[in-house]
Amino acid sequence: MGSGNVQVHRAGHEAFNQRDFEAMTKQYADTITWTDHAQGRTFRTRQEFTDDFLPGWVQTSSDIRIDGPRYLDAGQTVVCTFTVAGTHDGPLGPFPATGKEFALPLCEMWHFDSSGQVIGGDLYYDQVSLLAQLGLMPQSSNA
């Protein structure tokens, strides 16, 4: 039997897919350390994460969703691999919408304190793969 942390992580992803960022982060501490390693950005508060990070994904892809999550309970850390998929119908940094669909594998860790509150996270993904799928850089010719 795993800890309740997996259920919190799963509920957070379900809330993301519903665009309910407040529900997604209701188990987050006010002060967190959440790092998007691909972008080199760290968020220090729940409010910053909710207001600045999460909406950026939806701005880039209004139909973005988390597909096929697999959760690994490691006690006070839950590791999840999943795919974010959607249509690039909004700006991505300096790049305008391409209208292309994408499917990007991610690995995410949520870190919990002893009371089950989320105190941080780490997100890993390949930005080059995303840009290639969107036609914003050449795809590798290697097989």
Language-model features: where?
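C-terminal and inter-domain tail/linker signature
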Residues: 1-143
